[in-house]
Curated annotation (Swiss-Prot):
GO biological process, one term: flight behavior
GO MF annotation terms: hormone activity
The UniProt record lists the keyword RNA-binding: no
Family the entry assigns: Belongs to the AKH/HRTH/RPCH family.
Its biological purpose: This hormone, released from cells in the corpora cardiaca, causes release of diglycerides from the fat body and stimulation of muscles to use these diglycerides as an energy source during energy-demanding processes.
Subunit organization: Adipokinetic hormone precursor-related peptide (APRP) can form three type of disulfide-bond dimers: p1 (alpha-alpha), p2 (alpha-beta), and p3 (beta-beta).
GO cellular component, one term: extracellular region
Taxonomic lineage from the root: Eukaryota, Metazoa, Ecdysozoa, Arthropoda, Hexapoda
UniProt modified residues of type Pyrrolidone carboxylic acid: Q23
Keywords on record: Amidation, Cleavage on pair of basic residues, Disulfide bond, Flight, Hormone, Neuropeptide, Pyrrolidone carboxylic acid, Secreted, Signal
Sites of Tryptophan amide modification: W30
UniProt-recorded name of the protein: Adipokinetic prohormone type 2
Length: 61
């Protein structure tokens, strides 16, 4: 019984240590590094592609 309690305690400590390491390596800006704060160029390209797709669809008739 003592051996299983010791093993459980060691596993819990190992998991908590791994979680603490992960928290130390996390940075708040990580998820935002690929986000473009100015999405206007993306919207322009999207509209341009839509216009060209409509032109191509009109040519196939």
């Amino acid at each position: 019984m003592t051996q299983s309690c010791t093993l459980t305690l060691v596993l819990v400590v190992a998991v908590l240590a791994a979680l603490a390491t992960a928290q130390l390596n996390f940075s708040a800006g990580w998820g935002r590094r690929y986000a473009d704060p100015n999405a206007d160029p993306m919207a322009f390209l999207y509209r341009l592609i839509q216009i060209e797709a409509r032109k191509l669809a009109g040519c196939s008739d």
